């Protein structure tokens, strides 16, 4: 009979050193790695995502990297299914599992769970598509039906408005009542140790600036040109930091040096949001610098 595997999560802002630390931890713990990164999940988005190279991945099986094409949709439900598949694989391989990345919302959903959504009929899909033609009007209408639920949703958030419309059109029940009837179930039900990298803000800004420079030297602009030509600007991933600024540069909006500055500034802002989210959403987290966490992780191996 397969024994329960050991799992841990490693979180921290972008450019904080998660990738290298996760690989060291996986080597010490005899573990697979599951990436929770909203860009590394895509094939062909290599430079701008700063995903681990093939060389870095040698010897450690990585999941959640190069998983889908840039024009394919990916959401938290898909990620949970991915985690479940990876967990089964890790158990079968008699490996532990290190979960690592900057998109900590996915980790939160693994721990808290999401409610199962109803199967959406073609009729409902058509009604929802029609309603989404006027996002503001749909938001206002849903707010009259379910003010408590909709006050947490921006009028410019098409994904969550679409979900609310689907639920109401399909079930005739407002989202609040639906989620009461179908509460979320955590996917990870056992205790999950979470290790959070803490980095000085100025040091992190320097790391981000250096990484941006390396991306440009490694061919960032050529990569974005290829992605635009192959997939257009329509996919959601084409709005990611590093991609949207490069597209603006290609449009002649600013010069190359300004491109580096724009990416650096926007990435630093993202890092601040990630840090704020991590501090507010997870309890009993083991915090420390990369070297401090490395010592803790390797001693506990």
UniProtKB/Swiss-Prot annotation:
Its cofactor is Mg(2+). ATP binds at residues 12-19. The lineage of its organism: Bacteria, Pseudomonadati, Campylobacterota, Epsilonproteobacteria, Campylobacterales. Substrate binds at residues 14-19. It catalyses: adenosine(37) in tRNA + dimethylallyl diphosphate = N(6)-dimethylallyladenosine(37) in tRNA + diphosphate. GO terms for molecular function: ATP binding; tRNA dimethylallyltransferase activity. The record marks 103, 126 as: Interaction with substrate tRNA. Monomer. Residues 37-40 are annotated as: Interaction with substrate tRNA. Catalyzes the transfer of a dimethylallyl group onto the adenine at position 37 in tRNAs that read codons beginning with uridine, leading to the formation of N6-(dimethylallyl)adenosine (i(6)A). Belongs to the IPP transferase family. GO terms for biological process: tRNA modification. Pfam families: IPPT (PF01715). This is tRNA dimethylallyltransferase. Keywords: ATP-binding, Magnesium, Nucleotide-binding, Transferase, tRNA processing.
């Amino acid at each position: 009979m397969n024994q329960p595997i050991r799992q841990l999560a490693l979180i921290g802002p972008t450019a904080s050193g998660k990738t290298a630390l996760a690989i060291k931890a996986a080597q010490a713990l005899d573990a697979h790695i599951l990436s929770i990164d909203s860009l590394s999940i895509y094939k062909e988005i290599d430079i701008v995502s700063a995903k681990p190279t093939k060389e870095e991945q040698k010897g450690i099986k990585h999941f959640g990297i190069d998983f889908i094409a840039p024009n394919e949709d990916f959401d938290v439900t898909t990620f949970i299914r991915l985690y479940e598949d990876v967990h089964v694989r890790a158990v079968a391989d008699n490996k532990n599992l290190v979960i690592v990345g900057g998109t900590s919302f996915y980790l939160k959903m693994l721990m808290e769970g999401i409610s199962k959504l109803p199967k959406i009929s073609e009729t409902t899909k058509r009604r929802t598509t029609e309603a989404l033609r006027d996002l503001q009007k749909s938001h206002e209408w849903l707010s009259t039906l379910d003010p408590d639920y909709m006050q947490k949703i921006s009028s410019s958030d098409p994904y969550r408005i679409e979900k609310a419309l689907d639920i109401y059109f399909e079930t005739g029940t407002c989202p609040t009542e639906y989620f009461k009837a179908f509460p979320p179930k955590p996917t990870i039900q056992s205790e999950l140790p979470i290790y959070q990298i803490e980095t000085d803000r100025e040091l992190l800004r320097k790391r981000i600036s250096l990484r941006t420079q390396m991306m440009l030297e490694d061919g960032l602009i050529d990569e974005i040109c290829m992605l635009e030509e192959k997939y257009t600007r329509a996919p959601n991933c084409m709005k990611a930091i590093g991609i949207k600024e490069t597209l603006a540069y290609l449009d002649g909006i600013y010069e190359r040096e300004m491109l580096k500055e724009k990416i650096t500034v926007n990435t630093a802002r993202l890092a601040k949001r990630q840090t704020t989210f991590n501090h507010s959403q997870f309890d009993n987290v083991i915090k420390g610098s990369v070297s401090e966490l490395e010592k803790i992780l390797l001693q506990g191996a």
